[in-house]
Amino acid sequence: MNPVRRRKLFILLFALTILSAAAALVLYALRQNISLFYTPTQIVAGEAPVKHHIRVGGMVEANSIVRAKKGLDVQFKITDFENTIVVTYSGILPDLFREGQGIVAEGEVTDNHHFHAIQVLAKHDANYMPPQVKSALADKVKQ
């Protein structure tokens, strides 16, 4: 093989290897940051993956907030007005967190009716609701 042609082939193969590695790293990073959204009904139905990072949204059920006597542990229930799941969280809750409030929790499903949250997000004002929660709740009201 001609030395010039061989050098061009080597450079091309090297560039393709570098680009492939970069693409693989980008896809791996994106895969680690993707959090799919589920409703309490989907979790109860077993549609949500167990032990995978997901988001769940709904309304905090009335009289369901139970705080530990010591520490920052909190347990509460969220509902989509069809099904309810228990959420456990250890940390400081947002100031806007309260019963009847729309929230999105990030964490893992431990079983069909329990969710362990690592982050809890509350809506910012009276008119805001995450689009996924709004559409899921609208579907439940229409039925």
Curated annotation (Swiss-Prot):
Compartment list: Cell inner membrane
Membrane side Periplasmic: residue ranges: 30-143
Domain of life (superkingdom): Bacteria
Keywords linked to the UniProt accession: Cell inner membrane, Cell membrane, Cytochrome c-type biogenesis, Heme, Iron, Membrane, Metal-binding, Signal-anchor, Transmembrane, Transmembrane helix
Ranges of the Cytoplasmic topological domain: 1-8
PANTHER family according to UniProt: CYTOCHROME C-TYPE BIOGENESIS PROTEIN CCME HOMOLOG, MITOCHONDRIAL
Functional note: Heme chaperone required for the biogenesis of c-type cytochromes. Transiently binds heme delivered by CcmC and transfers the heme to apo-cytochromes in a process facilitated by CcmF and CcmH.
Protein name: Cytochrome c-type biogenesis protein CcmE
Organism: Legionella pneumophila (strain Corby)
